[in-house]
């Protein structure tokens, strides 16, 4: 018997603790709204949340995206296809945020040191992030291709190989 307000998992429902909250699985519109609103707030000099501040720093580093991010309605409707030959700014900025978070908590362990080595080699933290982004993309692609979780050891090794190349 179920009590009011208490969810008991069944064979067909995973327990609530195994479901991801919406904040970990935002929709395309949520992501676009986050970046366009962050850019609007940055330009207006409004107070930013810590995550918005990190996003705003990356947006500032990418002036090629400023006009698109300033057009919230257009950004919400725009599609980015490989045939256009344009980078999806929302995907690109989301990857910057993901890598920034990985570096802040050193997860996977060793990524911060690998990043620092790569940044020193490239003489640019921004270029290091772009190189790591390629490694992350390859790792995600491999996981999707093999229908397995991302291999964090292989991800870290890709970054270290990048840092060691002549």
Give the ranges of each region predicted by the language model.
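N-terminal leader/targeting peptides and immediately adjacent processing regions
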Residues: 19-66
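Aromatic-anchored, charged helix-turn/loop surface patch used as a conserved interaction hotspot
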Residues: 51-119
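Amphipathic alpha-helical protein-interaction segments
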Residues: 119, 131, 136-137, 141-144
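Glycine-rich, aromatic-bearing surface loops/beta-hairpins
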Residues: 141, 145-166
């Amino acid at each position: 018997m179920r009590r009011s307000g208490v969810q008991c998992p069944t064979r067909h429902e995973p327990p609530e603790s195994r479901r991801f909250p919406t904040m970990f699985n935002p929709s395309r519109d949520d992501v676009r709204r986050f970046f366009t609103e962050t850019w609007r707030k940055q330009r207006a000099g409004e107070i930013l949340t810590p995550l918005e501040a990190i996003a705003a720093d990356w947006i500032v580093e990418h002036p090629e995206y400023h006009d698109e991010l300033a057009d919230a309605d257009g950004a919400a409707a725009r599609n980015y296809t490989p045939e256009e030959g344009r980078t999806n700014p929302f995907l690109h900025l989301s990857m910057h945020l993901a890598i920034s978070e990985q570096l802040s908590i050193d997860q996977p362990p060793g990524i911060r040191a690998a990043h620092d080595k790569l940044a020193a080699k490239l003489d640019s933290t921004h270029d290091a992030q772009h190189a790591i982004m390629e490694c992350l993309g390859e790792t995600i692609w491999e996981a999707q291709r093999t229908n397995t979780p991302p291999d964090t050891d292989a991800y870290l090794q890709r970054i270290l190989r990048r840092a060691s190349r002549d």
